[in-house]
């Protein structure tokens, strides 16, 4: 085979932290690529900053560097490892941009590193808007009329040619960052300036608007012999104007005529050849004007993308794996198809089912943000479903979103027929403006008597889709007319199930319970069957067990053999509070079961993840995580147990229902999980063990809440029970705040009680992850938080080993952990959050909460210590003892590891960025060094907070941080920085002999801090808030800082750590080291 033997060592650059526009799909593609290249005998060096990935496991690559993704840091890795080649196309936009920077700064030439799959010229031709336009003109393909500009003056000239509305698109960004639609000249100027700021090359394209056109994507692969195949054609349900990452998408394309498809296919082949992507996958986006059929090319990603992951999962064709092998010289016809084992990769996949992807949003976390969907991506996750028909697939996707919908209406989310039923005017407004709820308003429009033609005129959604949704309403109306469950006959029930109606919807329509509908359905002999995802529409036998459910006659799942079977329930779509960290745990659970000779069965609905790769588990079910879908799988597979500990809140919410249906839950019991969540039971348990908790109470209504607040006192922490990610959690400092926040907490709690705790001000928060086998408990990691208590643990930076806790406090933490594990009879993972508060001269330990499940810190602990925490916990749950696994001592590394959170504020203009008890981060990074200060500096750099070496720093600390302001000010002056401050802080600093330039508050006129930001004349903002919210002066300053790309630190502890890091960076260079070498030094 003609694979390249002149290359021995290959560098892969990962995509960094999970952010909006770039999520787990790049962990999936990078992991596949590492496996594929090592399979071929190449040595793989990986650089990535995200510890929560399978890609950064020490077993995935030969040398793994968890380091910031800047060209300067990657150069140090290259100098140390001396790779022969760099594969830049599998790390998303981040990896591509770092590769381009390495090339532009002469690093690749200096060390003789060859870029494979796509070189810098090819990447620039695809990514730079003007070059791409010229390339399309050359091959006779139409593009939007547009002009590439680098200044606002040139943008205004372009607008005169293009006209309004106009689309602003920055070059070299992902997830549509900085892209927007301008409807008037005033907006245009600010949108262009923002676009220029966000483009790493300060370049934007001003182009004609094609809002309302139909949008399509083609996934294309090419090898070095110029063989090109189309993997998948994807159609956007939402028309142009909504970023494809925020659109509902369907595969295969449903509304293209054969002639249109062939024209688009021919164009795709021409594009990939003209741009010159030598090998691998590319994603090409098209728009079609529905009335004239005019087709234009929108853009091309010369790399594996979010859509590539979707196309891989939709077809079963492993795009990233094949792309990696093509990059080292293989041809498509030489590579076997893993699924059929008979066909080759040059066979274009054919599918006999319909796939629907739906985006998941988090606007509830950012109430001040504009929730309109535009050309800039805002969704934080997605779910994918597979069905035999569009209707079945569409309804399964809606229930896979986990937003309270169990299909297209007739469920707890449905407003129709309630007191909140929208009016005709509200419906028309929601249809004409794209938003996350628009799909539900299409239902209300039909229920209100609007026609498909009227809905099309308001939404531009293709009539074919609307006709199918109208048929779902007709089926629902038919069921309502029948009325009683017992009156529904077999044919009607089967027809409803084939159209994707859930038992929950039928229960709502017939006023019965879900379990009654399930019993009736089973009595009728109506069960789902499971079909294979096989790449070939059943033409060849499939050898990889990858299944979806549908209501037909013949099932394809294998009968149970001699092996034990265990089901792992995944986490569903990413959301803030439940993301890649839990998928990491699910993957390790599967690997551990396989090592023990137990058949692992993965159930998940997230197309971005490694857990839904067909070779992560023995059997994969791509299904929504609802009680109905999971019980159906358990009926078909007869597992010996189900793991609910690893997928976050989603599987925990199903645990009780599964247990009641007779499904065995392995590991910690459901009763223990409930005890830890039940405030009253847990409080009495804490008292029984002689441990401390902050004073707390529980309220089921507003009157009880007032009584509890009076007893507990302020500041008080208010939160609903049974939620993840601190949803609707707030700190209240007085009664008026309390009344406002408690009302919201009751809405979110949805019938569950609201919890009220005394908030411990100025306490240090500590996270502990441990494994217990029911007898012994071993601590895996003690993490000290850098931000004080009150910032959600998911948003706070934390450090292993702890940096300020005394040995007596650590001993007390260890003792409390063991007591709790024993009393709760934990089998598997456990996470405890402690707070240490100085009371007089003595530190006092409080227990904040206990979670007898995987926490989001498990991957970080595993990377910091080198211990495969989730793998060991799974083996304990499957019956091994810690002694049998030789796990007896807490691992304490010699190096310092700091986890830092990454926040999405740049996508939500105008939102105040102050951190609080509700989690808002989308991802995380890790900084590693022998020194705390350098590890912290690395974590900041990796998270995008570039600590400056010179320039101006705005310092504004609240009144209770006076002394800290003085010491920070002195340190910054000694480092050579110039200080800016408003009146109050300036007076304090000057009184202590610290030179400062005064700036006016926004309300006082000019020059104020926003003027400095606009002039690029401030490099860092250190601001601890005295007030919160985007409407305050401070809030506006913080939000403006984010939009201008200026780092903004809002807690005193982080500000002090940042100044320590800036001092250390003067004297100590950032060194890089692989995890494998670090772990060897710990032994």
From Swiss-Prot:
It is an enzyme of class 6 (ligase). Binds 4 Mg(2+) or Mn(2+) ions per subunit. CDD domains: MGS_CPS_II (cd01424). One of its GO terms (cellular component) is cytoplasm. Mn(2+) 3 binds at residues 833, 849. Mg(2+) 4 binds at residues 849, 851. ATP 2 binds at residues 719, 758, 760, 765, 790-793, 833, 849. Mn(2+) 1 binds at residues 285, 299. Residues 1-402 are annotated as: Carboxyphosphate synthetic domain. It catalyses: hydrogencarbonate + L-glutamine + 2 ATP + H2O = carbamoyl phosphate + L-glutamate + 2 ADP + phosphate + 2 H(+). Mg(2+) 1 binds at residues 285, 299. Keywords: Amino-acid biosynthesis, Arginine biosynthesis, ATP-binding, Ligase, Magnesium, Manganese, Metal-binding, Nucleotide-binding, Pyrimidine biosynthesis, Repeat. The keyword Signal does not apply. GO terms for biological process: 'de novo' UMP biosynthetic process; glutamine metabolic process; L-arginine biosynthetic process. Residues 403-557 are annotated as: Oligomerization domain. Composed of two chains; the small (or glutamine) chain promotes the hydrolysis of glutamine to ammonia, which is used by the large (or ammonia) chain to synthesize carbamoyl phosphate. Tetramer of heterodimers (alpha,beta)4. PANTHER family: CARBAMOYL-PHOSPHATE SYNTHASE [AMMONIA], MITOCHONDRIAL, CARBAMOYLTRANSFERASE FAMILY MEMBER. The large subunit is composed of 2 ATP-grasp domains that are involved in binding the 2 ATP molecules needed for carbamoyl phosphate synthesis. The N-terminal ATP-grasp domain (referred to as the carboxyphosphate synthetic component) catalyzes the ATP-dependent phosphorylation of hydrogencarbonate to carboxyphosphate and the subsequent nucleophilic attack by ammonia to form a carbamate intermediate. This is Carbamoyl phosphate synthase large chain. It comes from Rhodopirellula baltica (strain DSM 10527 / NCIMB 13988 / SH1). The lineage of its organism: Bacteria, Pseudomonadati, Planctomycetota, Planctomycetia, Pirellulales.
């Amino acid at each position: 085979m003609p694979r390249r033997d002149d290359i021995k060592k290959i560098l892969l650059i990962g995509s960094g932290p999970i952010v909006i526009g770039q999520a787990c799909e790049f962990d999936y593609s990078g992991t596949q690529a590492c496996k594929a290249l090592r399979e071929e005998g190449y040595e793989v060096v990986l650089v990535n900053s995200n510890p929560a990935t399978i890609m950064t496991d020490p077993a995935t690559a030969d040398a793994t560097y968890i380091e910031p993704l800047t060209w300067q840091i990657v150069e140090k890795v290259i100098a140390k490892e001396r790779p022969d080649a760099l594969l830049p196309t599998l790390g998303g936009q981040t990896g591509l941009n770092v590769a381009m920077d390495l090339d532009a700064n002469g690093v690749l030439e200096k060390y003789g590193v060859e870029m494979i799959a796509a070189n810098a010229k090819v990447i620039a031709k695809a990514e730079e808007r003007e070059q791409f336009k010229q390339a399309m003109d050359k091959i006779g393909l139409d593009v939007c009329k547009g002009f590439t500009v680098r200044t606002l003056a040139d943008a205004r000239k372009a607008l005169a040619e293009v006209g309004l509305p106009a689309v602003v698109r920055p070059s070299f960004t992902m997830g549509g960052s900085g892209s927007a639609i301008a409807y008037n000249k005033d907006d245009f100027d600010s949108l262009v300036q923002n676009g220029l700021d966000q483009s790493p090359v300060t370049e934007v394209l001003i182009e004609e608007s094609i809002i309302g056109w139909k949008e399509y994507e083609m996934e294309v692969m090419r090898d070095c012999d110029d063989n090109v195949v189309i993997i998948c054609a994807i159609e956007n349900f939402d028309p142009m104007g909504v970023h494809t990452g925020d659109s509902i998408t369907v595969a295969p394309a449903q509304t293209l005529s054969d002639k249109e498809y062939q024209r688009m296919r021919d164009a795709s082949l021409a594009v990939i050849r003209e741009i010159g992507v030598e090998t691998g996958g590319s994603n090409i986006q098209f728009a079609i004007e529905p009335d004239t059929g005019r087709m234009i090319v929108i853009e091309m990603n010369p790399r594996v993308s979010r859509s590539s992951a979707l196309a891989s999962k939709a077809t079963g064709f492993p795009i990233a794996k094949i792309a990696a092998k093509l990059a080292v010289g293989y041809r498509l016809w030489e590579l076997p198809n893993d699924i059929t084992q008979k066909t080759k990769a040059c066979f274009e996949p054919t599918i006999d089912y319909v796939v629907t992807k739906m985006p998941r949003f988090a606007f509830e976390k950012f109430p001040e943000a504009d929730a309109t969907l535009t050309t800039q991506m805002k969704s934080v996750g997605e779910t994918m479903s597979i069905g035999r028909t569009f209707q079945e697939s569409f309804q399964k996707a809606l229930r896979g979103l986990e937003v309270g919908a169990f299909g297209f209406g007739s469920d707890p989310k449905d407003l129709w027929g309630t007191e909140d039923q929208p009016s005709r005017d509200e419906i028309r407004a929601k249809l004409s403006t794209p938003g996350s709820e628009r799909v539900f308003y299409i239902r209300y429009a039909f229920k209100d008597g609007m026609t498909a033609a009227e809905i099309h005129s308001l939404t531009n959604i293709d009539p074919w889709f609307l006709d199918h949704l109208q048929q779902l309403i007709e089926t629902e109306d038919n069921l309502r007319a029948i009325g009683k469950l017992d009156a529904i006959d077999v044919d009607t029930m089967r027809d409803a199930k084939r159209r994707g109606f859930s038992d929950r919807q039928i229960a709502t329509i017939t006023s019965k319970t879900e379990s009654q509908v399930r019993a009736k359905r089973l009595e009728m002999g109506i069960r789902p069957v499971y079909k294979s995802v096989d790449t070939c529409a059943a033409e060849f036998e499939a050898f990889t067990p990858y299944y979806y459910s549908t209501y037909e006659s013949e099932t394809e799942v294998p009968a149970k053999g001699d092996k034990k079977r265990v089901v792992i329930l995944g986490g569903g779509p990413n959301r803030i509070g439940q993301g890649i960290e839990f998928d990491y745990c699910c993957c390790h659970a599967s690997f551990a079961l396989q090592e023990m000779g137990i058949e692992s069965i993965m159930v998940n609905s997230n197309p971005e993840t490694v857990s839904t790769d067909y070779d992560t588990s023995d059997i994969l079910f791509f299904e929504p995580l609802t009680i109905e879908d999971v019980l159906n799988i358990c009926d078909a597979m007869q597992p010996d147990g189900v793991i609910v500990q690893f997928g976050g809140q989603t599987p925990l919410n199903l645990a009780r229902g599964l247990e009641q249906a007779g499904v065995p839950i392995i590991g910690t019991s459901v009763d223990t999980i409930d005890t830890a969540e039940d405030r009253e039971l847990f409080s009495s348990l804490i008292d029984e063990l002689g441990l401390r908790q902050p004073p707390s109470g529980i309220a089921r209504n507003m009157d009880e809440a007032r009584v509890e607040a009076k007893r507990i006192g302020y500041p008080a922490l208010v939160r609903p029970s049974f939620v993840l990610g601190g949803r609707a959690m707030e700190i209240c400092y007085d009664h008026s705040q309390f009344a406002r926040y408690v009302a919201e907490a009751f809405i979110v709690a949805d019938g569950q009680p609201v919890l009220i705790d005394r908030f411990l001000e100025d306490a240090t928060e500590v996270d502990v992850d441990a494994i217990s086998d029911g007898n012994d408990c071993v601590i895996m990691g003690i993490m000290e938080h850098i931000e004080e208590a009150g910032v959600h643990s998911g948003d706070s930076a934390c450090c292993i080993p702890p940096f300020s806790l005394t040995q007596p406090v650590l001993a007390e933490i260890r003792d409390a952990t063991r007591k709790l594990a024993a009393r709760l009879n934990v089998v598997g993972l456990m996470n405890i959050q402690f707070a240490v508060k100085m009371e007089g001269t003595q530190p006092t330990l409080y227990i904040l909460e206990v979670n007898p499940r995987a926490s989001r810190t498990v991957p970080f602990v595993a990377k910091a210590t080198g211990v495969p925490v989730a793998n060991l916990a799974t083996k304990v749950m499957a019956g091994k003892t810690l002694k049998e696994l030789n796990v007896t001592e807490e691992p304490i590394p010699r190096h310092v590891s700091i986890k830092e959170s990454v926040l999405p504020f740049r996508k939500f203009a105008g939102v105040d960025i102050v951190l609080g008890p509700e989690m808002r981060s989308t991802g995380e990074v890790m900084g590693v060094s022998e020194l705390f200060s350098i590890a912290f500096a690395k974590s900041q750099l990796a998270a995008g907070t570039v600590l400056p070496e010179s320039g101006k720093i705005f310092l504004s600390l609240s009144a209770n941080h006076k002394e800290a302001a003085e010491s920070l000010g002195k340190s910054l002056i000694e480092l050579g920085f110039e200080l800016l401050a408003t009146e109050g802080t300036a007076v304090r600093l000057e009184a202590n002999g610290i030179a400062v330039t005064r700036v006016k508050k926004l309300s006082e006129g000019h020059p104020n801090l926003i003027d400095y930001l606009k002039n690029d004349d401030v490099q860092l903002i250190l601001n601890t808030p005295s007030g919160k919210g985007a409407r305050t002066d401070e809030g506006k300053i913080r939000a403006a800082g984010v939009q201008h790309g200026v780092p903004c630190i809002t807690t005193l502890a982080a500000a002090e750590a940042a100044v320590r890091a800036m001092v250390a960076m003067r004297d100590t260079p950032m060194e890089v080291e692989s995890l494998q070498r670090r772990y060897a030094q710990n032994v």
